[in-house]
């Protein structure tokens, strides 16, 4: 990520290095990454917030990037599908993306929703995708999201003393009600 030729990717690296990403976009933020061996192919964020704040819209996909050598293989679609699957398991009706340009997300089913100002005061285009209420798309996303959820919970519980969070309400845990604890 540090070697990314995109300023926002370098900014994400900085936020992660300083442990400040979750303060900015929410404690449940995830950073899905696609790798080829030890090489990073693509990444994004999936979080309760993005650069449009404050807002009731959630969840958000942000910092979407594919390294030049891996472009034209629709890896962005894989990242979007991951986030959409998790959002489906969370029973969200929509998923959002804030972006300054047009042309990429429309081909993945995102539609322009509205203009709003970002945290820097700049105008930004907000796109959203309706997550199917019923049908095969929702079923596929739900099945995929359930698998991802299990992996997230497993990773979060690894080397964690269960008493660290099982004695508290789900509101105090970054997993929320996902873990079933």
Task: For the regions a language model picked out, list residue spans one by one.
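Active-site rim helix/loop that mediates acceptor-substrate recognition in acyltransferases
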Residues: 5-35
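Conserved beta-strand in the GNAT
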Residues: 31-33, 39-49, 60, 65
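A short, well-structured alpha-helix characteristic of acyl/acetyltransferase catalytic modules
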Residues: 1-6, 137
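Active-site beta-strand termini and strand-to-loop segments that position acidic
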Residues: 35-37, 129-130
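Short hydrophobic/aromatic beta-strand or adjacent loop that forms the aromatic wall/cage
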Residues: 29, 122-127
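Cysteine-centered metal-binding/redox modules
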Residues: 141-181
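Conserved acetyl-CoA pyrophosphate-binding loop and the N-cap/start of the following alpha-helix
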Residues: 70, 74-82
């Amino acid at each position: 990520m540090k070697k990314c030729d995109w300023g926002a990717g370098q900014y994400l690296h900085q936020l992660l290095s300083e442990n400040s990403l979750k303060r900015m976009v929410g404690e449940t933020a995830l950073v899905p990454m696609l790798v080829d061996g030890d090489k990073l192919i693509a990444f994004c964020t999936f979080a309760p917030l993005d650069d449009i704040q404050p807002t009731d819209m959630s969840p958000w996909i942000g910092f979407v990037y594919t390294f030049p050598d891996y472009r034209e293989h629709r890896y962005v679609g894989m990242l979007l599908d991951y986030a959409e699957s998790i959002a489906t398991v969370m029973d969200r009706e929509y998923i959002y993306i804030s972006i300054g340009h047009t042309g990429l997300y429309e081909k993945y089913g995102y539609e322009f929703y509205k203009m709003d100002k970002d945290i820097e005061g700049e105008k930004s285009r907000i796109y959203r995708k309706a997550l199917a209420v019923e049908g095969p798309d929702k079923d596929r996303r739900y099945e995929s999201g359930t698998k991802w959820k299990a992996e997230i919970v497993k990773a979060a519980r690894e080397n964690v003393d269960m008493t660290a969070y099982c004695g508290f309400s789900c509101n105090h845990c970054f997993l929320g009600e996902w873990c079933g604890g």
